[in-house]
Every structure is written in C-alpha cells, then in structure tokens.
C-alpha cells in the first residue's frame, strides 16, 4: 500500500501518551488502540476492551444539583435520564456511537468519551513532535492497547508509515490474534513486549475468557519467522491466579527455551475508578500482591534463565 493510502487509514485510539520510558527502548510515545479479545479480571484499562467509542460518567463532576440537564436535552438516543438522586442514569443498551453530543454539551466534563477516530497521519503528526527525544534516546513509537492487532489494518498502516518516517517501532501485544494479521505488521517492528499470563490453558480461559494455545503458537511463530526481532515476554503477577512458583517456572522455562528475555510485572489496582465511570464492577476487588511473593518469583525466573545460560 502507498504512503498516501496508509496516511488516510483510520482507527480508534483512546490515548496517546508521550515521554514513556517503560514501553520499549528509549523515550517513547505510546499509542493506545481500542479493542481487545481478552477480558482479564485484572485489566487496568477497561476502556480499552471494546472497539467502539464509549461514554464515561464521573458523578463527582456532575452539575445536576444545579439543575443542569444539558446531556438529557441533547441525547438523540433517549439514553440519558435524570435519576431520583439528582445524578443522571445512562441506558447503555441505547447508548451507541451517536456523535456523543452529550459529552460535547457537558459543561463540567462529567461526561467524557473513551476513544477517538484518527487517521495514521494524525497520529504520527503527534508522535513526530518528540522526534528529538527519540534521536537522543533510541526511542520511538509503541503501539499498545487494548490489543493493537484487534485493529490489524490500522496497526499495519501505522507501523509501515512510521518506518517510512524513520521512527523506531515497538508493539505491546497479548498475542491473541491471527498470524495472518500479525505477520505482515511484524515486518515493520523492531521491538515486542509479549504478554503471557499462564501456560495452564484451563486457568487461562477462566481468567481471560480465551485459550492460551494461539498465544503460545504465535510466540513460537515470531521466534522462527523473525529470529532477529527483540522480544521481551512479560507476565503480570496476579494474586490467586498465577502467583505461584509452579506457574512462573513454567513460563520461565518456555522463555529460556525460546531464548527471549522474561520480566514479571507486579499486580496493581490502578484503573479501578474507570470501571465505575463505565458503570461496571472492578472484578479483582481489594486484593493486593505480597512483595515477598514477587521477590521469590523473580528469583525463580533468574534461576531458570541462569540454568539456560
């Protein structure tokens, strides 16, 4: 596809985060794409899961106590009504992609939208604003999500056009995508963060809603098809799910076999408020991860990779 066609390709993003230092080498701009095939119980970005633009409601900012009903007046779907407690009620079965006039009309920004339709050119024009930092640090653009390959045409066009502009490219993926969508995009990628939650398929299905078979197959495909591509496998350590030496040792052995770096990410509770904004319940509740558990699991990883070396 030509550069002109790639630039006009559109997709839905929910954030563009500048000056990130944890999403690949150097200083990076992370582009978050909406849509994810997994429903991880610990997801800290619930607004990333659905591919469509969504309406969020922060009751703490609402001005209904001052008799403001601008959102009710402009809603074209009759999805918003005033509730008895002087807040508003949103019928999300009726609330669809209607232009989100309610969010535009809300004077206090109690109503906001998660998701913006952008062209590749619009995204990369933002990314290029920090080109001087990339040049000095070895950074660039990272596609994250959600799952970038849930919007395969947009992801491919972004990566291909970024490379045309000499921007270093990275992807953060859960690995659950068709290989036919991943392979052409990976031709334009220099670095991959690859998530593996568990090698126990039954456990994986229970916690994420999908099998891990495709995820493991795609990791092996990447190593065989793109042996020079830098891959770092990461596992979020989740209390009550995979926080055992048995779980982590299994993944550590796989990564040692495939000769890829392996990192553990401690569970955190960031993002729980966003569930409330979307009228959803945060699935994990109040659980916390014991620091001593993380220390022990990191020792397991070090031992397995030391044995491999």
From Swiss-Prot:
Species the sequence originates in: Oleidesulfovibrio alaskensis (strain ATCC BAA-1058 / DSM 17464 / G20)
Residue ranges occupied by any Radical SAM core domain in the UniProt entry: 22-309
NCBIfam families given in the database record: PFLE_PFLC (TIGR02494)
One Gene Ontology MF term: oxidoreductase activity
The protein's name in its UniProt record: Isethionate sulfite-lyase activating enzyme
Induction: Highly up-regulated in the presence of isethionate.
Binding site for [4Fe-4S] cluster 3: 75, 95, 98, 102
Pathway per the UniProt entry: Organosulfur degradation; alkanesulfonate degradation
Gene that encodes it: islB
Residues that hold S-adenosyl-L-methionine according to the record: 42-44, 146, 195-197, 268
EC number from the UniProt entry: 1.97.1.-
